[in-house]
């Protein structure tokens, strides 16, 4: 199955950013908070309050007003909105101004559905336009009288044309969501979330003192459990009245660090029975805050026993003690993402943060051709979540559209450029009343590494949303983005940033193991899910966990081939250099051999002439000539871009390449390899023929790996065997004699000219001139091949 390269490639687009007034280079043109998106014009209608002045008709005085707003085929109403005690709603409705010519505002009596009055506004002449930072349009009272039914009411409202820059945009009820239940409209609104920063809590259980078992005739076998929130960790079992553990139990907590750690000592009476012999609780605020890489002091803590214990003949209070180190490790960065997709490396304490490096701005323009997981559903209620650092941004939900337009812009502070921005697009399942318990469905993700983004350029591209499954590579649509990174730091701070530590110093002074990092990352994800689920509107847990989902570690033949090709590409240049040098030695032609000897002779004996040539003006002229040739070549290669850069400072950057199908072995896909990659563990495949075929394929691959590992082990064992020969006295004596002879030769050849002659003679021998040439193996190589290895001992 071959993938279409053009279909899955990043395409360059040319939107009208900033309403055709945005500059491509922020240094040379006007910018605004929305210069990376296309301007969207809306008709805003703010319905604030109604007043009932009816005095003639008694039934009119108990009116329950409802406002209906109509533009073309779109209709919105306050019917399902909660009404205040003074008949106020204070709700903003937003319509696409191109959907009609006349805006109709109708006031009705809700219980009887009686029309009280109607107001019509012509869009072409009667509605003003507001562009921030202009002041808000003042609301007006409109008389809504009906002489036939004796309704005398007034409606306070305001109507204006605006864009997505307007302050009411995040709280507006859009016309495409008019069918959404009023209680669910909040789930369609855009929002920015700041996740609380995370910190490690280190509980080091050192030892116990004077521990007493419930059974006085038994030596206690105790382990310690510590619980913070929903996470419980325990130590190993240690026996004795003064057991020792010296074991770290590390938790993850979020600011403002108000939790409590509960510690229990469990005595293992036998394999089936356990009993608690002591408890202790400590608040996080009582622990030692470590803001530099260090260790907390070890202190003794009295344990609260389940039953009071008093030794015989002693009236003093008796208490077992536990020696511990309790600290909040604020000098670490808590990883919530995998290393490849990390977007933040800062420590918990703000004093350890590096200087601000730059600003990242993202314009989420829209999407095209979206496909949901449910093929029966023709439309999608989609929204985008962008995550960088602890700041999450969520666009509004565009209802019933496979090609939504958002045109929302967000920005982030960047402290490290070697990070990744993650954007996920989801199908909103929370906007219908009957889908209260349904989860939002992920459509796909796009990741943009910042180290591939050049500063001061605006990348406007359409990124494919790819989903890889057992059936192959599937395109779920395209996400249109405008990306810009601008440096804020200047001078030394900017150019020294690539050389500073990627992680806080504590990660290098007291590093955590990969096993610990994976376990703590799982804790961090759960805490983030819980924290963001408590916001309003909530960023749901399934969305947060999907955005923080790490790379799969399942076995994949496709990825194995990919990693081999990557490794081969890295060492290809080294292998090429080695092959060129080896070809000089192995060839029968004399020309390359004499060239090598000539170059060696010049560098060994004519160094004065080389020094004169380097310090002369001739070399400087040659370097300047090379620079001119390089610049002319670039100018002639793309004259239009050079002209734009020189006169307009406006160069369209090339599209960012985020996925290399050939490198990832996705240009030609083996469906069985994909089925094996996405198979569960243990395997859920029931077809024995398929399992046998996969097993035979793996055996063939591992056969080559086995032989390669065996050859490498054999050569290494022969090298070790050469050192074991030194244990023999005769060999040691010969080695000392050879060392003495070598030192004698070095001393005799210490003169510069003699040393150069010795080096030149060695080069002459190494290149194997015709009179030195010998196709038979060298004596040292013959000796090395005769050294023993453990391969002979294997059965």
Swiss-Prot record:
Principal subcellular localization: endoplasmic reticulum
TM region(s), chain numbering: 590-610, 612-632, 730-750, 752-772
Membrane topology designation: Multi-pass membrane protein
Keywords: Calcium, Endoplasmic reticulum, Membrane, Metal-binding, Repeat, Transmembrane, Transmembrane helix
GO cellular component: endoplasmic reticulum membrane
Cofactor(s), names only, from the UniProt record: Ca(2+)
Record-annotated C2 domain positions: 24-142, 180-298, 341-463
UniProt cross-references to SUPFAM superfamilies, sorted A to Z: C2 domain (Calcium/lipid-binding domain, CaLB)
Residues that bind Ca(2+) 2: 57, 109, 113
Annotated residues for binding of Ca(2+) 1: 57, 109
Alphabetical list of InterPro entries matching this protein: C2_dom (IPR000008), C2_domain_sf (IPR035892), C2C_MCTP_PRT_plant (IPR047258), C2D_MCTP_PRT_plant (IPR047255), MCTP_C (IPR013583), QUIRKY-like (IPR047259)
Expression sites by tissue: Expressed in root vascular tissues and meristems. Observed in flowers.
Function: May function as a signaling molecule by regulating the trafficking of other regulators.
Sequence similarity: Belongs to the MCTP family.
Official protein name in the record: Multiple C2 domain and transmembrane region protein 12
Organism whose genome encodes this protein: Arabidopsis thaliana
């Amino acid at each position: 199955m071959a993938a279409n390269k053009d279909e899955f490639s990043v395409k360059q687009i040319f939107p009208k950013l900033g309403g055709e007034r945005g500059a491509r280079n922020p240094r040379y043109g006007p910018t605004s908070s929305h210069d990376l998106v296309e301007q969207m014009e809306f008709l805003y209608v703010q319905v604030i309050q109604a007043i009932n002045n009816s005095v003639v008709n008694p039934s009119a005085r108990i009116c329950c007003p409802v406002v209906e707003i109509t533009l073309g085929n779109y209709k919105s109403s306050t019917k399902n909105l909660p009404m205040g005690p003074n008949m106020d709603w204070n709700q903003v409705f937003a319509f696409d101004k191109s959907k009609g010519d006349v805006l109709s505002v109708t006031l009705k009596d809700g219980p009887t559905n009686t029309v009280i009055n109607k107001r019509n506004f012509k869009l072409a002449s009667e509605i003003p336009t507001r562009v921030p930072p202009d002041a808000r349009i003042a609301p007006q009272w409109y008389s809504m009288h009906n002489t036939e039914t004796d309704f005398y009411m007034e409606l306070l409202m305001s109507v204006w044309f605006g864009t997505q820059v307007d302050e009411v945009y995040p709280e507006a009820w859009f016309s495409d969501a008019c069918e959404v239940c009023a209680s669910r409209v909040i789930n369609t609104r855009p929002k920015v979330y700041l996740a609380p920063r995370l910190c490690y809590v280190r509980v080091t259980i050192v030892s116990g003192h004077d521990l007493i078992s419930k059974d006085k005739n038994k030596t206690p076998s105790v382990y310690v459990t510590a619980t913070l929130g929903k996470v419980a960790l325990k130590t190993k079992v240690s026996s004795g009245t003064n057991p020792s553990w010296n074991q770290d139990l590390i938790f993850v907590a979020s600011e403002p660090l108000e939790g409590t750690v509960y510690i229990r000592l469990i005595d293992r009476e036998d394999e089936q029975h356990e009993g608690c012999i002591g408890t202790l609780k400590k608040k996080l605020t009582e622990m030692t805050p470590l803001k530099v890489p260090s260790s907390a002091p070890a202190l003794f803590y009295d344990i609260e026993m389940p039953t009071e214990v008093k030794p015989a003949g002693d009236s003093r209070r008796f208490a077992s003690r536990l020696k511990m180190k309790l600290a909040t490790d604020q000098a670490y960065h808590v990883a919530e993402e995998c290393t490849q997709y990390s977007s933040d490396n800062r420590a918990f304490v703000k004093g350890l943060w590096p200087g601000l490096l730059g600003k990242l701005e993202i314009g989420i323009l829209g999407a095209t051709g979206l496909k949901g997981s449910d093929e029966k559903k023709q439309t999608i209620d989609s929204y985008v979540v962008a995550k960088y650092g602890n700041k999450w941004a969520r666009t509004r939900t565009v209802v019933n559209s496979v090609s939504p337009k958002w045109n929302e812009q967000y920005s982030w502070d960047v402290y490290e450029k070697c990070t990744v921005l993650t954007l996920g697009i989801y199908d909103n399942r929370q906007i219908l009343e009957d889908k209260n318990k349904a989860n939002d469905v992920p459509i796909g993700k796009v990741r943009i590494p910042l180290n591939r983004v050049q500063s001061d350029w605006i990348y406007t591209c359409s990124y494919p949303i790819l989903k890889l499954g057992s059936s192959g590579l599937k395109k779920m649509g395209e996400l249109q983005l405008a990306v810009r990174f601008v440096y804020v730091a200047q001078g030394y701070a900017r150019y020294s940033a690539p050389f500073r530590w990627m992680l806080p110093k504590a990660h290098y002074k007291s590093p955590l193991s990969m096993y610990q990092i994976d376990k703590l990352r799982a804790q961090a994800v759960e805490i983030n899910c819980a924290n963001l689920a408590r916001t309003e509107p909530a960023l749901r847990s399934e969305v947060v966990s999907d955005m923080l989902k790490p790379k799969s570690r399942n076995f994949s033949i496709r990825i194995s081939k990919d990693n081999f090709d990557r490794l081969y590409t890295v060492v290809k240049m080294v292998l090429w250099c080695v092959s060129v040098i080896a070809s000089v030695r192995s060839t029968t032609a004399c020309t390359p051999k004499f060239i090598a000897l000539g170059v060696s002779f010049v560098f060994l004996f004519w160094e004065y002439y080389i020094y004169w040539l380097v310090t002369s003006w001739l070399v400087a002229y040659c370097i300047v000539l090379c620079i001119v040739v390089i610049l002319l070549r670039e100018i002639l290669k793309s004259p239009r871009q050079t002209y734009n850069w020189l006169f307009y400072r406006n160069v369209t950057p090339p599209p960012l390449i985020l996925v290399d199908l050939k490198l990832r072995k996705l240009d030609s896909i083996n469906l069985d390899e994909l089925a094996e990659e996405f198979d569960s563990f243990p395997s859920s495949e029931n077809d024995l023929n398929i399992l046998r075929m996969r097993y035979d394929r793996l055996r063939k691959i591992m056969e080559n790996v086995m032989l390669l590992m065996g050859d490498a082990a054999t050569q290494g064992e022969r090298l070790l065997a050469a050192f074991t020969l030194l244990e023999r006295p005769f060999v040691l004596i010969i080695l000392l004699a050879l060392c003495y002879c070598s030192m004698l030769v070095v001393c005799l050849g210490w003169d510069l000219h003699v040393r150069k002659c010795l080096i030149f003679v060695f080069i002459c021998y190494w290149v194997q001139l015709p009179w030195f040439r010998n196709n038979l193996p060298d004596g040292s190589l013959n000796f090395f091949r005769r050294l023993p290895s453990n391969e002979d001992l294997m059965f």
